């Protein structure tokens, strides 16, 4: 029986509806961790004020590239910008690893008929978190590099590696072996993966648009809300990809 996107979408939404409480809690918890880590590692207000003093210069330099804008900063401002970027990247990476590990564990446990909470899912996922961390670090690096060179290569890399977290979690194989398997399966089933990835990207862009419309909320609360909504979108994509992989799962994989 052929695999259809409609069937996968229906299964994914059914799972989301049945496990909504656990998924919402997981999305909120990982969003809170992400925001708290970012607040802990971001430079202090005095340093940020030094960086924000250049905002008017950036606004008047609309035709310059990012590289040229950074080159115009003083060495002190460049160091502060690097700290801000590193804090945001690290906190987002940790939050995403916990979200992916917890979600994949939750999906796996529920598929086996076991009920688990969001906290239990994260706890059970601890053994696979180091491999997920390495995998997502490499994947993020490659995708960002592809987007920097040109947007299309970044999207292609994202599609190629989309199944690798599920493979690492379910097959307990190494990071690079999981990436290799993901590339083969993803390109062989690109018609089922690309539409879901495009919907995921579109949802993320809509959330970015909403950033400027949550000015009534304090910044930390707005950050948690937006991060939780973003995590919820990613959770739905993970359910879709997990279900797809279970239907495509090769029989010759050695665990």
From Swiss-Prot:
Stored InterPro entries: UPF0259
Membrane topology value: Multi-pass membrane protein
GO CC, alphabetical: plasma membrane
Keywords: Cell inner membrane, Cell membrane, Membrane, Transmembrane, Transmembrane helix
Location of this chain's protein in the cell: Cell inner membrane
Parts of the chain that traverse the membrane: 22-42, 90-110, 118-138, 141-161, 192-212, 221-241
HAMAP family named in the record: UPF0259
NCBIfam families in the record: PRK02868.1 (NF002774)
Family according to the record: Belongs to the UPF0259 family.
Protein name: UPF0259 membrane protein YE2218
């Amino acid at each position: 029986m052929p695999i259809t996107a409609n069937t996968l979408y229906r299964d994914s939404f059914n799972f989301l509806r049945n496990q909504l409480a656990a998924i919402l809690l997981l999305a909120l918890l990982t969003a809170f961790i992400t925001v708290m880590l970012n607040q802990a590692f971001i430079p202090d207000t005095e340093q940020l004020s030094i960086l924000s003093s250049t905002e008017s210069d950036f606004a008047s330099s609309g035709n310059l590239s990012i590289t040229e804008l950074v080159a115009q900063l003083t060495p002190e401002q460049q160091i502060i910008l690097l700290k801000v970027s590193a804090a945001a990247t690290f906190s987002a990476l940790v939050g995403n690893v916990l979200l992916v590990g917890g979600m994949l564990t939750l999906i796996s446990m529920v598929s086996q008929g076991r009920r688990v909470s969001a906290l239990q899912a994260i706890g059970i996922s601890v053994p696979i978190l180091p491999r997920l961390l390495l995998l997502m670090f490499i994947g993020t690096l490659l995708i960002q590099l592809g987007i920097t060179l040109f947007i299309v290569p970044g999207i292609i890399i994202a599609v190629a590696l989309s199944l690798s977290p599920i493979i690492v979690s379910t097959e307990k194989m190494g990071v690079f072996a999981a990436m290799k398997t993901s590339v083969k399966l993803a390109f062989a089933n690109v018609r089922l993966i690309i539409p879901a990835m495009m919907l995921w990207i579109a949802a993320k862009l809509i959330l970015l648009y909403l950033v400027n419309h949550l000015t009534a909320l304090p910044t930390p609360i707005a950050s948690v809300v937006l991060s939780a909504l973003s995590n919820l979108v990613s959770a739905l994509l993970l359910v879709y990809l997990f279900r797809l992989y279970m239907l495509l799962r090769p029989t010759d994989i050695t665990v």
